[in-house]
Amino acid sequence: MNIIFLQIPLKTDSISSLIVEEKTLSVIELISSGGIGGNIIMGTLALLSIYAIYILFERYSTIKKASLEDESFLKSIKNFIEQKDIQAAKTLCKNTDNPISRMIEKGIDRIDKPMTDISAAIENQGKLEVYKMENNLANLATVAGAAPMIGFLGTVIGMIVAFHEMASAGGNIDVEMLSKGIYTAMVTTVGGLIVGIIAYIAYNFLVSKVDKVIFQLEARTTEFLDLLHHNE
């Protein structure tokens, strides 16, 4: 009986020696193991993410600058208009670098024209200013839509490669190799979704900022047109 009991630990040790150590793969290893196709997809997504972040900061800086208002600007314009000093009003507009000053300058250039002409000139300049602020926003929207599709394309390519390896292996299917290929394929979808979400949020954030500036421009131009109407 003692001999039997002594043999039990030996069998336990032999079983524990058969336990396979769990293997883990880092994200970098998964990406780098995707082959040329997977690396191209992930490289493309990386470039798109950099481009999206660049547009976010560059456009935010431009829009923020356009939204800054000088409280004394319209007051000075009002004083010049009331004093019939049109040249001084033009000079002030030229020396002030913001959308509202350029729009009002267009109106002052047509100060002797009918109000409809003045309003049309201001509106046309306003459209140009909005176009400047919205520059590259369409590209950001494109990144938001294209990145997930590019990531999904990488997944499809990865799955095709994985199943091709299964077919080539015949009956000798390596489950570890197959699982690794599927993991790698799914990484491109995750990458595409991350880039797409970042670009989508950035796009809507910038659009909301542009809308706020447009509201400011409309309010200031209305004040200017009312001023001209009262001084006719």
Where is each model-derived feature located?
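Hydrophobic membrane-targeting segments
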Residues: 8-72
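Residue-level signal for the membrane-embedded core of alpha-helical transmembrane segments
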Residues: 41-51, 144-150, 154-157, 189, ...
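Residue-level signature of catalytic and energy-coupling elements of molecular machines
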Residues: 35, 53, 89, 104, ...
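Juxtamembrane non-transmembrane "cap" segments at the membrane-aqueous interface
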Residues: 2-17, 157-170
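Alpha-helical membrane-interface segments at transmembrane helix boundaries
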Residues: 28-38, 123-144, 175-187
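Predominantly long cytosolic amphipathic alpha-helical stalk/bundle segments
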Residues: 61, 66-153, 157-171, 201-232
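Hydrophobic alpha-helical transmembrane segments of polytopic membrane proteins
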Residues: 183-202
